[in-house]
Amino acid sequence: ESYSLNHISHVVLGDEKLDYSDVGTFMETYENDHQRFIDYHIKDVELVHRIDEKLGLIDLVMTMAYMAGVNYNDTLGTTAIWDCIIYRELMSKKIAVPQPKDHKKAAFVGGYVKDPHVGMHDWVMSFDLNSLYPNIIIQYNMSPETLIRMPNAIGAKAANGATFRKDKVGIIPELVEKLYVTRVSTKQEMLKVKQQIEDEGKSDSLVRKATILENKQMATKILLNSLYGAMGNRYFRYFDLLVAEGVTTTGQAVIQHAEKAVNGFLNKAMQDDKDRVIAMDTDSLYVGVGDLVDKYCKEDPVQFLDRFAKEAIEPILEKSFEQFAKDTDAYTNRMVMKREAIADRGIWTAKKRYILNVHNNEGVQYAEPKIKVMGIEAVKSSTPEVCRDAMKQMFKIIISGDERKTQDAIAEFKDYFKSLSADKVAFPRGVSDITSYADRNHIFSKGTPIHSRGALLYNYYVKKKQLDKRYRLIQNGDKIKFIYLNKRNEMQQNVISFPDDKLPDELGLNKYIDYDLQFQKTFLDPLDIILKSIKWQAEPVANLEDFFV
């Protein structure tokens, strides 16, 4: 949602940065309360240290670096780290490392994303293909040295027609297999510890153990997933367009094959031809089974669906993937699709945008359902924090299926929103280059983005009112906030930006904040996308019958 230290500290630690607002500005704190200024920086360092103690992020980087044999900085990229991994493997086998080549820039297809069934759905199960792209590489033995560059070649065939040798294992598939085995065993151990935490409650030792295992499996996952990013990069030593495109096109074929298998099985079970796959995203299926629950099990749907997924759908998928591998003459069958989430309700607004009320995830049963949000404004750092928090609460009400309660909650939050200061309700943004938009005669030039326009106005009026010694000016690269104004203000402008701590009172703009427009833009517009998808209104709509009540 936000990468600010204050937000991360609040979420991870339940703590925040030291507040100095009672002293004044940051510069005034330095001049008038130097001890507070020192304490502020000490607290920042303590927060960073505590976050790392809890999340083990430095451990994650070190784990990746040691696994790959690279410097710590190289773990942040994809090509350098895999270049080193493959280099070490080739050296161990006494195989000469090929020289890098120049490759022309070329676009190729990505993952398949289905147009979702927009709206609200009861009882949704998600199924996820285990490490799709890495397993495709293994399944078709995809490696530059195994690619057969002859027409009508015999071998393992990717969906784009690329054919690979089956008489020897490629270097890249061999490396992927080693990493994959490590990740699977680590993840299984991690899930056991997480279930233990759910059953027994949190303890420092269990949380720490779960974090260590999470970091180890995450390091392996990052390495596995970054391989495809490297293989699709024309600057990678082992780049080959046929191989890179073979991975994605085969991924598309596999996920659509899975959709057909699931729909076919459920159609047969329910004796209809309904499309129950609500959405698909590269390696995931979201299946609506509300009618199945209504027909067969209303008392304990979560347990029923857990069993149904294991004993019915997963075997069907396994059988279909075996046939797919046979049809494409694969080197081996590596496709495994397991049930991930069980949710009693889900809402889709568009591709990759949904809300799920999850009861069980990968076999971990939650004491209380957890809301999973993907692609919705509430999880974007460009939305004010107060609106993100309110939207999460709103999702819980919406998921309950009560339109009137949702409308009441919106009205209540709007009243609270209007009582807040500018820094709480303003849009968080970053400005990369405000100087290029400056205009000596008109402050800003035509076509200036709204947040940059607000920044130039702020700088102009802070200097005009001789406040620049008290308040710092906005510079290129700064994190700022901007807010809408009524045009009746001194500037006769509809926006002002300010550094992310406070809008100076001396500018006299607080009384001109357009709270209605700000509420509409920051909260109601994003929420309305969800409400429209389920045909709800944000406010009660009067009709003729209400007149006679």
Name these PLM-found stretches:
Residues 17-27, 100-107, 157-158, 191-194, ...:
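Active-site-adjacent bridging/hinge elements
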Residues 1-45:
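Active-site-proximal helix-loop-helix substrate-binding element of RNase H-like nuclease domains
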Residues 9, 44, 48, 183, ...:
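A residue-level signal for conserved active-site and pocket-lining positions in enzyme catalytic cores
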Residues 168-236:
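Active-site cores of enzymes that catalyze phosphoryl transfer or operate on phosphate-rich substrates
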Residues 22-31, 162-163, 231-239, 286-295:
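A short small-residue
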Residues 52, 62-140, 144-149, 154, ...:
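DNA-dependent DNA polymerase catalytic subunits
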